Design a protein with these regions (language model features):
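Extracellular (secreted or membrane-anchored) zinc-dependent metallopeptidases
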Residues: 1-21, 25-129
Length: 130
């Protein structure tokens, strides 16, 4: 996604933004449900008041009005907005939701030829200079 000094924010240059966006493509919402204390439709992600930004030590106990428990907020989830270096998990429930997308509206992935090896074109790389 870029490097520091190339116009890319260095806290987000480890490729996790792509992971986050693929999560959306596979039917995941942000862990705060895209609303104040909203619903992400996944039972094993704790309720969150809003997005987290930056990077924290676990547990990050910024308790909010949504019912976060003593385990702290799930800031390290790919579907939050923390720095790339702090994102590292999808929950089992999120994985189930993504598999449901692959078995449903994204089922074409299973028969796609996009993962097959590319066949050589039979073009010669020999160049003659005169």
């Amino acid at each position: 996604m870029g490097t520091a000094g190339s116009g890319v924010f260095s806290a987000n240059d480890l490729g996790r933004t792509a992971t986050h966006e693929v999560g959306h493509w596979l039917n995941l919402r942000h862990i705060w449900g895209d609303d104040y204390c909203g619903n992400d439709f996944v039972d094993d992600t704790p309720e969150a008041e809003e997005a987290n930004y930056g990077c924290f030590n676990f547990p990050h106990n910024d308790f909010n009005g949504c019912g976060s428990d003593s385990a702290g907020e799930m800031f390290m989830n790919y579907m939050d907005y923390v720095d790339d270096g702090c994102m590292n998990i999808f929950t089992y429930g999120q994985a189930e939701r993504m598999w449901a997308a692959i078995d449903g509206p994204r089922s074409g992935l299973k028969t796609s030829k996009g993962c097959e090896a590319v066949q050589p074109l039979g073009i010669s790389n020999n160049v003659e200079i005169k």
